[in-house]
Curated annotation (Swiss-Prot):
Classification of source organism: Bacteria, Pseudomonadati, Pseudomonadota, Gammaproteobacteria, Pseudomonadales
Annotated binding of ATP, by residue: G37, P38, N39, G40, S41, G42, K43, T44
Chain ranges of the ABC transporter domain: 3-205
Subcellular location(s) of the protein: Cell inner membrane
Pfam family of the protein (one): ABC_tran
Gene Ontology terms: cellular component: plasma membrane
Protein name stated in the entry: Cytochrome c biogenesis ATP-binding export protein CcmA
Membrane topology qualifier: Peripheral membrane protein
Main localization of the protein described in the UniProt heading: membrane
Length: 210
């Protein structure tokens, strides 16, 4: 599908505190939006709004010109969400985690899962229980999903957390390649991106921070 995501007059409150208001932006094929701002400025809340996990205080989000609330099926098909937590099961192996996660959307073959783990530097860790992995390795298990799923919209909350220098460089390249191939990325990160696609821009929520 050709992605067109629009925020119009978007506002969000948490615990009776205004995080942001009157946000207007549009995202399409090839775009990357980095959301920045101090802690507590609403970065994760904005991601959750765009992913359909929260409702805005005011304004609306449109997908393909229609309200997001009316596009649940289309959003589920278009979206890959990876939150700040790795979101994996400690007692499952790396392969089992990816098999389970993919089964929720689009099942993947064992060969594809092993190739994805190799792509994130985890060759040889396929059968290792995730509770024995380091934080960086657990994060890479979660990020291996980016090598398996092909939805156009990737929404990622602090994806570079716990990655080493090589992992950061590999992820930057993969995100840029996704945009160059017509995908869309929305992310939060405190990391300064070295590789940015032509459709990159930044949205700073700091102006509303108390």
């Amino acid at each position: 599908m050709t992605l067109h995501l629009q925020a119009a007059g978007l506002a969000c409150e948490r615990d009776w505190r205004l995080l942001f208001e009157q946000l207007d932006f549009e995202l399409g094929a090839g775009d990357m939006l980095q959301i920045s701002g101090p802690n507590g400025s609403g970065k994760t809340s904005l991601l959750r709004l765009l992913a359909g996990l929260m409702q805005p205080t005011a304004g609306q989000i449109l997908l393909g010109g229609k309200p997001l609330a009316e596009q649940r099926h289309a959003l589920a098909s278009a979206l890959l969400w990876i939150g700040h937590a790795a979101g994996i099961k400690d007692l499952l192996t790396a392969e089992e985690n990816l098999t389970w996660l993919c089964a929720l959307h689009q099942p993947a073959s064992r060969e594809a899962i092993w190739a994805a783990l190799e792509a994130v530097g985890l060759r040889g860790f396929e059968d290792v229980p995730c509770h024995t992995l380091s934080a960086g390795q657990q994060r890479r298990v979660a990020l291996a999903r980016l090598h398996l799923a092909c939805p156009p919209l990737w929404i990622l909350d602090e994806p570079f957390t716990a990655l080493d220098k090589q992992g950061v460089a590999q992820l930057e390249a993969h995100l840029a390649a996704h945009c160059e191939q017509g995908g869309t990325v929305v992310l939060t990160t405190h990391h300064t991106l070295e590789r940015k696609p032509s459709g990159y821009r930044e949205l700073n929520l700091g102006q509303w921070a108390a």
